[in-house]
Amino acid sequence: MRFLHTMIRVGDLDKSIKFYTEVLGLKLHRQTDYPDGKFTLAFLGYGGDTEPFLELTYNWDTDKYDLGNAYGHMAFGVEDIYAACEKINELEGKVVRPPGPMKHGTTVIAFVEDPDSYRVELIERKGKSAGY
């Protein structure tokens, strides 16, 4: 067994793809329209087809979702957290907790929201691989 992907529903697929590729460096691996079901799936990731993906689901007749109160956040390692937060503001994301040390620690983190208001934690990984 292994983890394959996580899926989030988005209201504007192009805006979401731009956010995750230009800010967080994911690559669009494949995008498929399903006209009979009136939805599009886009799979983004850092590696090849054997690595986990972020699946963006765009339902053609829905542009806004109620995220509820159960969703926590996704976390991404970034080389320069300050530059990432600047880019997020440019791409209509929202920095909700500016970069700084985490409580009771020294790791520099920030919390942002993507164009659909999904919460994303950024963890600065200077001098290291941005991943774990």
Regions found by a protein language model. Name each.
Residues 47-51, 62-63, 81-82:
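Short, charged/polar surface micro-motifs in flexible loops or helix N-caps
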Residues 7-51:
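Core segments of cupin and vicinal oxygen chelate
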Residues 35-37, 62-63, 126-129:
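Flexible, glycine-rich phosphate/dinucleotide-binding loops
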Residues 2, 29-32, 76, 82-132:
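Vicinal oxygen chelate
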Residues 38, 70, 106:
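Exposed loop/turn and edge beta-strand positions of beta-sandwich/beta-sheet ligand-binding modules
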Residues 3-5, 69-74:
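Eukaryotic phosphotyrosine signaling hubs
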Residues 49-52, 117-119:
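Short, charged/polar, Gly/Pro-enriched secondary-structure boundary elements
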